[in-house]
Amino acid sequence: MTETIIPAGMTEREYFEIHATEKEFLDWYCKQDLPQYEKPSVTVDMVAYCFVEGKIKLLLIRRKAHPYQNCLALVGGFMDKSEDARHACQREVREEVNLDLPLEKIEQLMTVSTPGRDPRGWTVTIAR
């Protein structure tokens, strides 16, 4: 592995952000810059509802495990690295309540990132 020589008067960051190749920048970024940023877990929560006899019915589950064991909750869970939020919602609904939800019916409502809302750590959830 060759050592990169940074020209005089230029910061390491400036060199890699502006003058290096994209591959060199990404290699540097993953080693030098990325570790300084906290990383949240990303989850999805599905707000699934329907109308029955003129009333709105909301799909909730009862949590089987901690945290919030036995409490009512929206269907949801952690995203896998290989999926986007819509596919994560579709998978979680299928896993938790055995319902096949068409992707075209899934829309994003909001993102919740309130610090401390999940006792397991920093979690950002995408509500759909």
Model-derived features with residue positions:
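N-terminal leader/linker segments that precede catalytic domains of diphosphate-processing enzymes
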Residues: 1-128
